[in-house]
Amino acid sequence: MFKGIRKRASNLSIYAVTSNLSATNAPSDQQPASNSPSSYESILSQVHDFEIALKAMDYLLDDRTQQGTELLHEQAQLGSSDGKPHAIFPLALGVMEFIEATLGFEPEVMARAHKTLNDAESASTTNAKYNVRHQLATSNIYPPGTEFQVTLAESTLLNALLMLLTENNGMVESVKALYKLRKAYQTLDAVYKKIKELEPVFNRNLAKLRKAANKGLLEVPRLNGLVNGGTRLKHSISTVDLPGYESLGSSSSSSSATLPEDLKLMKNLEKIYLMRKARIEGTNLGNNTGVQHQPLNLFSDLASSIAMKQNGNGVETSLPIIPQYGKFNNGNEEQVEEQEEEGEGEEEEEENSDNEHFVDAVEELTIGDINSSSLADSSAQSILSSVETSPSEVQSTDMHLHVSTTDEFIHSGVQLCFGILQVVLSLIPPAIGKVLSIVGFKGERETGLKLLWKTAITSRNVHGELALLFLLMFYDGPVQFVDTGFRLPSANKLKNIINLENKTSVTDDEVELIKDSPESYTSQLLKRARHHFPHNALWILQEGRMLAAEGRLAQASTLMQNFTDNPNNKIQMQQIEALLIFDRATIYIYMHEYDKAARDLIYLIEINSWSKAVYLFMAAACYLERYRMVRMGLQSPQINADTKLSLNGDVELEAKKYSDLFTKYLNLSLSYVPGHGANAQKKGGLGGSGKQMPFDKFLLRKWKHIEQRKKRHPELSLADVVGTSLIHELIYFWNGYNRMSPQDFELALKLLGYSGAPNTELSANTLHNNYAKIEETEDEAMIRYFLQSVALRQLGKVKQGLGILDSHVISKYVISEVPQFRFHKMTYSPYLYPTAFYEKTMFVWLLRTSESTIKQDVGRAVHECKSYLKKAETVGEGDYELSNRTSMRIKAAGDRLDQLGSLSR
């Protein structure tokens, strides 16, 4: 699971109590932690809690949040009377509420999640101290309490992020959030170093387990006389979830008086094992249960993975290795078959009842009940039942099932949280990043991505799926966190793709290959997630985003539309429904299907309170663009010829309809902007707060320009006093110019020309045929030419696009570039001036590294491009609307160029 991670000495301090595992001088042949028999029940109870929590969070991933919440509350009530802490339940509930809160930003959901995560922090601290005080080792390699250090770090991290995302927080709350973030960072850093330090121990323990299970048959003297005397049992009872427990055959001197307790432990171990097995195979929620099964051989990848057994005739026959529990038999094959059939029913019963209390063996099985004639009917049949799995899962479950639930949680939890922290910190603009590094924060994007990829590939739990969601957002989300436009020509050549199916470990070298072509691997992982969680629209949303990122817009919109149109599909989480519909609306915009986009955007104000002003403004911009399309006689490329609008005498009527719709929804959008107009007190902004969002400020600036022109031209409608296309500016900031097809760009060029001055470059107007009713100002022309230059580049007309950008945009505010860079500080459209230099880096890169270039010099290209990025940073200094998005793009491009520069050396 952790192949390729460098070993690095470090210490992990878990409170002031000495643990049973020295972090600083662990010997190379270190044995698993040892627990006293009196602690076995407490340990297995905690492990059972973790499996319950993981199952509950899987319900969330399958859009069955209510079932997951009910499971947690039920288990919390059952455990409330035992006097033991159950820290994982508040964390699981907090994770579920955090995801719900950050999907929709509703203030009441965010407040509820904040309270739950506070409870999770307190419970984690209490449970960590409890395990240290009672020396409860639930891990084979980590000190007692480590798992609850991870739950503490996870709850602290999520709580800090939630506090930072709550915009109406004051300075005190923001400082508290940063303190929590620092606390989580330090804990995760310490545990991560410990994981790397103890990786050899982890691998040796796993190897010993596999070797021991493969040695052959094992005497079980404690059960002598129960079944035909001297039964020989395959050593397949794994005690990986109970460190230090001695197997049945390890103490021949033990009396039969301890048998009920042993059976109790075995029963509880079996329950945990079956829960983990079902989770890993994706059947724990009742999904994917119709697959044909065959007995599982956990060691099928080893040369000697088949155990040999002599039948009654002295002939050796091969038997599949049973993963944890052997089976009583006396060499009679018919009896074995009968027991296997009975075991199937028992296993199904166990998987459907994992929320029950653990078995009390003393109550269920007394000493007097034990005899050879009745044993076949006892609970031992279930304990020693065979385990089955689907053929496709045989390889994948080998390592997963022999890693304890606790170790799995520690590894995947640390990798997820520390990976996210590393990436998020690396995205912070340099000026802020330097300040944070002084107080202990340091983000390394490559390290973070490596951890997230490993978690997404190797972990079949909520951490693995959240890592996948983060990667999908990072690579394919509407906000550009990574700039994949800077590529070398050789990068487009077909490479061997690694098959991630059933992959339980991944090396650093493999991760590097994966990061070079992420789209080839996120698709594989997404397919697996959709298979495990078929009911959740979240995965439909992610697949739609992935298709859109690949330019397959029609497929993306059809996938999303068909899902919501199907009456059998019920989306339980309204936040996911809102995200899916918003993304579908943006895809319709990219395709110039503005009626469908406006329909979706207007519907959003009924189900989501994120920013009604932005939804309505975007809908208004869609109707404005339809108005222009009608007047120009244009239609979306997706509309068939026989369905196109008849342009005989209906043009003016149709145009007036869209003009009126634009006016209606523009005015309505203004009423939802916090602090503006007569309806200033209406709910609006992020999380319904009174603070204006960046796009609210963008909306108000655009309205100011429209209002000024309306005063100069009172005889014109609002639709006729708008300058450059509003929706195309919005398309750019929602990353649409990296998703549109050539046909969409061709239409975009024409529509952008609607507002152009007559007979100017790329204008749709002439002296004899003029659509625009107002004069194009230089500021509006700069916006138009900027967007048209990018469209030309995407159409392959790189030199023409760069010429437009230089002559009609950059030259308007740059005074000189050499020997000293000087420029006019313009304020009409603040985002435009740094963004133009950012886009110039892409033009220059394509020209300097194209295959037609006689000699490619990647180093020079990187140096030249970075010089333009430096100018973008200089021009973009200061706080302005959309400044975060602009600076994020610039930083993403700089990081990518640094990476390419290091490869060229």
Swiss-Prot record:
Its main location: cytoplasm. It is found in: Cytoplasm; Nucleus. Residues 334-353 have a biased composition (Acidic residues). The keyword Transcription does not apply. It comes from the Eukaryota. The keyword Ligase does not apply. Residues 325-356 are annotated as: Disordered. SUPFAM superfamilies: TPR-like. Keywords: Cytoplasm, Nucleus, Phosphoprotein. One of its GO terms (cellular component) is cytosol. Pfam families: Iml2-TPR_39. Signal peptide: none annotated. Inclusion body (IB) resident protein that interacts strongly with lipid droplet (LD) proteins. Involved in LD-mediated IB clearing after protein folding stress, probably by enabling access to the IBs of an LD-stored soluble sterol derivative that acts as a chaperone in inclusion clearing. Belongs to the IML2 family. Interacts with lipid droplet proteins. This is Inclusion body clearance protein IML2. It comes from Lodderomyces elongisporus (strain ATCC 11503 / CBS 2605 / JCM 1781 / NBRC 1676 / NRRL YB-4239). The lineage of its organism: Eukaryota, Fungi, Dikarya, Ascomycota, Saccharomycotina.
